[in-house]
Amino acid sequence: MSDLHNESIFITGGGSGLGLALVERFIEEGAQVATLELSAAKVASLRQRFGEHILAVEGNVTCYADYQRALDQILTRSGKLDCFIGNAGIWDHNASLVNTPAETLETGFHELFNVNVLGYLLGAKACAPALIASEGSMIFTLSNAAWYPGGGGPLYTASKHAATGLIRQLAYELAPKVRVNGVGPCGMASDLRGPQALGQSETSIMQSLTPEKIAAILPLQFFPQPADFTGPYVMLASRRNNRALSGVMINADAGLAIRGIRHVAAGLDL
């Protein structure tokens, strides 16, 4: 029997990409899975596909009331919460400082940080009491942009660096009751979109990066699928396999950190 059998897992952004892969994996592990998903169509698809195995709630991660509404349903269904996975996010399609108009940069910043940072903070706030009671865990999705430049523009990169600080602070504040960790995947097959303020809400990451381009920069030389990254989340959520880790961020970068030096700077053609 899996360590996660009957564990109550709450995942944001479970309708596509990595979030959907996490929903699938935790259901396979025997967990009671719930998700907060912005898209009504994706909520309907989740319910049709997984039936009674999923509690799919339509809502916005930038709205505390939506978190609370989802959590109330989770506690009614399961009586507890064992792990919160903050995963919903948006990307900036490498929108650069120089080429982005100031007004757009400002509005894009607020929209992106509201989702990528405030969304995590509000989720942590809503879930903390239940996780303290269960002595559970939080896991937040980062990115290779939490460690390296060039995985996005300044908006996205700054948001993921901010999330690392949030993980450390929450791990400190919630110890010893709640373990708080992060997983930073590299580029993958995903429907990740951008901010509406940047005109990117209908543009997915795969329209900016081809599978060949992603595979070419990775020392492991393959194009990752979302399911390739679910293992670290399962390990971190497991009470038996992760009693000792908190404030830890797993850099699941397919070897990016071991690359040799190729480019001195990204602005040589300015």
From Swiss-Prot:
Pfam families xrefs: adh_short
Entry annotated with the keyword Cell cycle: no
Biochemical pathway: Aromatic compound metabolism; 3-phenylpropanoate degradation
Positions bound to NAD(+): 10-34
Documented EC number(s): 1.3.1.87
Gene3D superfamilies in alphabetical order: NAD(P)-binding Rossmann-like Domain
Keywords: Aromatic hydrocarbons catabolism, NAD, Oxidoreductase
Catalytic residues identified in the record: Y156 (proton acceptor)
Top-level division of the source organism's lineage: Bacteria
Catalysed transformations (reactions): 3-(cis-5,6-dihydroxycyclohexa-1,3-dien-1-yl)propanoate + NAD(+) = 3-(2,3-dihydroxyphenyl)propanoate + NADH + H(+); (2E)-3-(cis-5,6-dihydroxycyclohexa-1,3-dien-1-yl)prop-2-enoate + NAD(+) = (2E)-3-(2,3-dihydroxyphenyl)prop-2-enoate + NADH + H(+)
PROSITE patterns tied to this protein: ADH_SHORT
Record carries keyword Oxidoreductase: yes
Signal peptide: none
Biological processes, Gene Ontology terms: 3-phenylpropionate catabolic process
UniProt-annotated binding residues for substrate: S143
Stored InterPro entries: BphB-like_SDR, Dihydrodiol_DH_HcaB, NAD(P)-bd_dom_sf, Sc_DH/Rdtase_CS, SDR_fam
GO molecular function, one term: 2,3-dihydroxy-2,3-dihydro-phenylpropionate dehydrogenase activity
Function: Converts 3-phenylpropionate-dihydrodiol (PP-dihydrodiol) and cinnamic acid-dihydrodiol (CI-dihydrodiol) into 3-(2,3-dihydroxylphenyl)propanoic acid (DHPP) and 2,3-dihydroxicinnamic acid (DHCI), respectively.
Family: Belongs to the short-chain dehydrogenases/reductases (SDR) family.
Protein name: 3-phenylpropionate-dihydrodiol/cinnamic acid-dihydrodiol dehydrogenase
Organism: Escherichia coli (strain SMS-3-5 / SECEC)
